Amino acid sequence: MKKTQTWIITCIYLQLLLFNPLVRTKGICRNRVTDDVKDVTKLVANLPKDYKIALNYVPGMDVLSSHCWIRVMVEQLSVSLTDLLDKFSNISEGLSNYSIIDKLVKIVDDLVECMEEHSSENVKKSPKNPEPRHFAPEDFFRIFNRSIDALKDLETVASKTSECVLPSTLSPEKDSRVSVTKPFMLPPVAASSLRNDSSSSNRKAANPLGDSNLQWAAMALPAFFSLVIGFAFGALYWKKKQPNLTRTAENIQINEEDNEISMLQEKEREFQEV
């Protein structure tokens, strides 16, 4: 009986794990981001403020949701950081900067590899090709931090996302984070100010309340049915095994009674012979 109960519980858990869509993998590339990103602030402080870093930038990055630009931006960040690394490799005074950039290059390369391994339906092609631009260090690494945050929240399962369509009124002057240099006040890893600013607004735009409710309903129904199926399988197995267990117990009792009768008969014969 104990084995039967254990099997029923195991069956239910397997049903939940295999068929429950609420069990999702979020942040699939989160483990690729190491603590080395904390050195970004130190690197920005070491670089001259008037230094310009080349980057192929996706137009409208601050208007579009992250799934529209994340793949392209990560690839372009890898190219720009690699070029920056090559420039510091020949400068003996910049060994500290070289070490930091080298670690950042490895992180970005790992993220590119992670995105290739986990092809997400959320990731779409940018509506425009990247444009070559030059950024001050703090603006460049602001884009870096935002891309890191977007990748840390990347999911493998497609969700309701907005279309990657640029507003017709978008212009370089309105792309404020590109044209205006702001104090580098971002936390090295989370970039919380950005998350509270543009990232949050993008996510809200990409997942309206109505769509979110429908999405949760669509996930909850299969989860409920999978739970019912698990209980049904467990009940059927118990019902099938219960008669066998009853018959086995009865057979054991009959065998014991037969053995007792045989022993009594044997003793009776021995007594008669004496």
From Swiss-Prot:
Topology of the protein relative to the lipid bilayer: Single-pass type I membrane protein
One MF annotation (Gene Ontology) recorded for this entry: growth factor activity
InterPro entries given in the database record: 4_helix_cytokine-like_core, SCF
GO BP of this protein: cell adhesion; positive regulation of cell population proliferation
Cytoplasmic face of the membrane: 239-274
SUPFAM superfamilies: 4-helical cytokines
Extracellular side: 26-215
Residue stretches spanning the membrane: 216-238
Function: Ligand for the receptor-type protein-tyrosine kinase KIT. Plays an essential role in the regulation of cell survival and proliferation, hematopoiesis, stem cell maintenance, gametogenesis, mast cell development, migration and function, and in melanogenesis. KITLG/SCF binding can activate several signaling pathways. Promotes phosphorylation of PIK3R1, the regulatory subunit of phosphatidylinositol 3-kinase, and subsequent activation of the kinase AKT1. KITLG/SCF and KIT also transmit signals via GRB2 and activation of RAS, RAF1 and the MAP kinases MAPK1/ERK2 and/or MAPK3/ERK1.
Protein name: Kit ligand
Species for this entry: Neovison vison
